[in-house]
Regions:
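Glycine-rich phosphate/diphosphate-binding loop of Rossmann-like nucleotide-binding domains
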Residues: 1-71, 78, 90-91, 98-100, ...
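Surface-exposed beta-strand edges and their flanking turn/coil or helix-capping segments
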Residues: 26, 50-52, 124-125, 135-139
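A generic membrane alpha-helix/interface feature
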Residues: 33, 73, 134-136
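Rossmann-fold NAD(P)-binding glycine/threonine-rich loop
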Residues: 80-137
Length: 139
């Protein structure tokens, strides 16, 4: 994944859907990442603590600009925002305030969501489909 060694990295996924959260959880675990999945019933205290300790954050909450630079700890180096909320006159806005991150945390690599994560989702789904096909064939 991403051409990097993820062994020992801590990933936080804010989504438990079968389209985003669960497949990515499997991919990250298979790449020796420690994964925490956060969902709508996770306490705010736990969400805050997990985000502060994450190396990688993947969001899929569907809440525009829910997070900004203050939510992420110094360890965080990669954010993948899988959400996109359309706003009249604007292309779309994700869970993470992109402009805020670019201004205050230029050390973080962040997807802008719009036009990027849809491609990542498609690639992940195709990859999952190939893996299931191979398993069913007995490879």
């Amino acid at each position: 994944v991403f051409g990097k060694d993820l062994s020992g990295k801590k990933a936080v996924i804010l989504n438990r859907s079968g389209l985003i959260g669960l497949p990515l959880q499997g991919v990250l675990i298979n790449n020796n990442c420690t994964v925490t999945t956060i969902h709508s019933r996770t306490s705010k205290t736990d969400v805050d603590m997990e985000l502060k300790n994450a190396d990688i954050v993947i969001t899929g909450c569907g809440k525009r600009k829910l997070f900004n630079h203050k939510d992420f700890g110094d360890r965080c180096k990669l954010i993948i925002d899988c959400s996109m909320t359309k706003i009249a006159g604007v292309k779309g806005v994700g869970d993470v305030d992109l402009e805020d991150i670019l201004l205050y945390r230029p050390d973080i690599i962040i997807s802008s969501g719009y036009g990027q994560t849809g491609v990542l989702t498609t690639v992940a789904l195709v990859n999952n489909l190939i893996q299931v096909y191979k398993l069913n064939r007995g490879d």
